[in-house]
Amino acid sequence: MQAKIKNKRVLVKFSGEALAGDNQFGIDIHVLDHIAKEIKSLVENAIEVGIVIGGGNIIRGVSAAQGGIIRRTSGDYMGMLATVINAVAMQEALEHIGLDTRVQSAIEIKEICESYIYRKAIRHLEKGRVVIFGAGTGNPFFTTDTAATLRAIEIGSDLIIKATKVDGIYDKDPNKFKDAKKLDTLSYNDALIGDIEVMDDTAISLAKDNKLPIVVCNMFKKGNLLQVIKHQQGVFSMVK
C-alpha cells in the first residue's frame, strides 16, 4: 500500500558545500542534476517546493573575515552573493529537466532575479513553480539555516527539510564515531541545549516559536526526499 502524502508545501535547505560534491570548491554538475531530479519527484507528486542553498562552496562570511582584512559584515554580504550564484545554478538545472522556476533574492539584483516578496513567492508556489530563495535573510550575521527557517514560516511550509550527507541526526558525528546513535525524534529544547548539531540556535528557536517541524535526511540517497514527504520511517530524523 502506497504511503499517503501528508505535506503540500515544503522548504528544502541544501548546504553550499553539498553542491561541491567530492570537491572542496565550486559546483559539481552531477550533484546539481541529482538534486534537481529529487526536487522534480516532489513536484510530480503535487508538492509545492521552496529551496534555500548555502554559499559555502564559494565563500563563507565567517571564514572570509578570519584574516582580519575583510570585516564580518562584508564577508557575510559576499556569502549572500554566493548563495545567489548557487540559486541561479539550481534554477538552470531544474529548468533543464522541465520544471518552471523563479529565483527570489533578499538583495535586489533585478537583472538576474526577482526581489523577495512573500506574497509573490506564495503565488508562484500555487502555480506549481519551484521558488529558490537567495541572499539569505538579506542581513549579515544570520545563517542560511536561519534564512531557510524564516522563508519556510513566511510561505507557510508544512515542514523544513535539511538535506545533508547523513540520514538523520546522531548523538555524535557518525563519520568519526562508529558507535554514534541515530535519533529518530527529538524536541526543540533537546536540539537547543545539547551538543547535537542540527541548525544554529536562532533557526531552531524560530522553528520552535512557530511550531515548524525540522527534518534532517540524506540528500544523496535516490528518492529520499519523496520518502520523507510520505512520512516513511527510518530515512530521516525530526525535530518537533
Swiss-Prot record:
GO terms for biological process: 'de novo' CTP biosynthetic process; UDP biosynthetic process. InterPro entries: AceGlu_kinase-like_sf (IPR036393), Asp/Glu/Uridylate_kinase (IPR001048), Uridylate_kinase (IPR011817), Uridylate_kinase_bac (IPR015963). UMP binds at G55, D76, T137, G138, N139, P140, F141, F142, T143, T144. Catalyzes the reversible phosphorylation of UMP to UDP. It is found in: Cytoplasm. It comes from the Bacteria. Its EC number is 2.7.4.22. Keywords: ATP-binding, Cytoplasm, Kinase, Nucleotide-binding, Pyrimidine biosynthesis, Transferase. Its main location: cytoplasm. It catalyses: UMP + ATP = UDP + ADP. This is Uridylate kinase. Pathway: Pyrimidine metabolism; CTP biosynthesis via de novo pathway; UDP from UMP (UMPK route): step 1/1. ATP binds at K13, F14, S15, G16, G56, R60, T164, Y170, D173. Belongs to the UMP kinase family. One of its GO terms (molecular function) is UMP kinase activity. Inhibited by UTP. GO terms for cellular component: cytosol. Homohexamer.
